[in-house]
Amino acid sequence: MRTTAYLLPLAVLFATALPGCYYDNEEELYPNSFCDTVNVTYSGSISKIIESKCATPGCHVAGGTGTGNFTVFSELKEQVDNGRLLPSVRREAEAVPMPPDGALRACEVRQLELWVAAGALDN
């Protein structure tokens, strides 16, 4: 009985103290939560989106099935100028949803919108 009297408070102490040693690191929980909408440029933001989500093997590359070779800026700009790029990435009802394997993140769509609104420059 004496052993239980000593072990029970000790067990309660450890049970309450150990969870206090755990902490959440916001950067680890939400690694890509920052969305830069101030410094949106083709070379800094847009080209990365295009390369990873559009100009992929078989899609918007030379010989791909997509309309235009987006590894060539002028062909990407043509899709911007004819008004097809934004409705597709926004997945609007009348447009062909792009990319076909899943929507862009909201941040990526916003960056594309800002870049187009600023004239879709090759900067």
Residue ranges and their predicted role:
Residues 1-21:
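Sec-dependent bacterial lipoprotein signal peptides
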Residues 21-123:
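Aromatic- and Gly/Pro-enriched helix-to-coil junctions and flexible linker segments
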